[in-house]
Amino acid sequence: MTKVLVMFMDFLFENSWKAVCPYNPKLDLKDIYIYDTTLRDGEQTPGVCFTKEQKLEIARKLDELGLKQIEAGFPIVSEREADIVKTIANEGLNADILALCRALKKDIDKAIECDVDGIITFIATSPLHLKYKFNNKSLDEILEMGVEAVEYAKEHGLFVAFSAEDATRTPIEDLIKVHKAAEEAGADRVHIADTTGCATPQSMEFICKTLKENLKKAHIGVHCHNDFGFAVINSIYGLIGGAKAVSTTVNGIGERAGNAALEELIMALTVLYDVDLGLNLEVLPELCRMVEEYSGIKMPKNKPIVGELVFAHESGIHVDAVIENPLTYEPFLPEKIGLKRNILLGKHSGCRAVAYKLKLMGIDYDREMLCEIVKKVKEIREEGKFITDEVFKEIVEEVLRKRNKN
């Protein structure tokens, strides 16, 4: 590393809210946007069923975040679902409200009744689905259904996204044929759905790049599942390949292994790739906790971005550095998304962490007292007891009592 680069990085670390690898590419991604499907695909997680009020609250919070589009549901599923979608559509949100529809007029009619701004109409295109899901229908037959659905929805003034289900297992020449036909029928956006999460970042980039070269004006959207933990990076590589829109769910909930996590995608683009999405980032933690509560799906404590332990530090070596400059062991400052860091005490704690806690408590100490408390903290944690603030207070009081007796 050159001396100039070292000086530049020192300047950045001292004057920035983030510190990332200087070799990260700066992506020229203009006019990209997110369409969130927590209320539809997220609710398809086995065991999840949001109430009407819960869906409304989540929609409001997504809108507060600043998302361009919210996929509110699948109206044809039930009258209750249709009522919820219609209520969200008439809530007066800034975001456009979309509904999911099969490539069937009755589905689209139901969506129209719900007053939505647009639809995502889908039909499978892979040989696997054509054989086993559609009883050996030909691609041309499927294509005809898709085109009719797009034309019908456009006749009714809707924004239309056409989604090729199982796109990543569809031959590229078939994808081009299907999506060109959808565009010619009036589709505003076409989707690459990685339905089983089987694509790699490189294949997502290739598919999106190839498709973009063959389309005239329709935006490309990517809808990635997380079966191999690739949903977020596949989404990013889709953008690199020319996609403009990304499908997400809060906390990555969804069928099987879930979808691209909204909060992870946003912060990866913002922090690592220096992309300004124009969003209210401080909304993210509250939104994630809300979906955690309403879905009943607990987030791991080490969940990227918003997990309980993401900005927590215990190791003495780490704590010493973090107190001097948090970016030594954090890629970005938690305050950027409305969170705070937490200095924890345990087996690996050193004098600096304990001194930090004592200072917060307003307690004076000398070196001997500090070392005694550190020793006690390690002993109690190794006995299996967590050093909560209350436990630490008890340790301090015990040490003070002993010192006063002497």
Curated annotation (Swiss-Prot):
Annotated CDD domains: DRE_TIM_IPMS
One of the GO BP terms on file: coenzyme B biosynthetic process
GO molecular function: homocitrate synthase activity
Pathway where this protein functions: Organic acid metabolism; 2-oxosuberate biosynthesis
Family matches, as SUPFAM superfamilies: Aldolase
Signal peptide coordinates: none
Annotated ranges, domain Pyruvate carboxyltransferase: 32-285
Transmembrane segments: none
Enzyme Commission code(s) on record: 2.3.3.14, 2.3.3.-
Catalytic activity: acetyl-CoA + 2-oxoglutarate + H2O = (2R)-homocitrate + CoA + H(+); 2-oxoadipate + acetyl-CoA + H2O = (R)-dihomocitrate + CoA + H(+); 2-oxoheptanedioate + acetyl-CoA + H2O = (R)-trihomocitrate + CoA + H(+)
UniProt KW keywords: Transferase
Function: Catalyzes the condensation of alpha-ketoglutarate and acetyl-CoA to form (R)-homocitrate. Can also catalyze the condensation of alpha-ketoadipate with acetyl-CoA to form (R)-homo(2)citrate, and the condensation of alpha-ketopimelate with acetyl-CoA to form (R)-homo(3)citrate. These reactions are part of the biosynthesis pathway of coenzyme B and biotin.
Additional record remark: Has been shown to catalyze the formation of trans-homoaconitate. However, probably physiologically functions as an (R)-homocitrate/(R)-dihomocitrate/(R)-trihomocitrate synthase.
Family statement: Belongs to the alpha-IPM synthase/homocitrate synthase family.
Protein name per UniProt: Homocitrate synthase AksA
Gene name for this UniProt entry: aksA
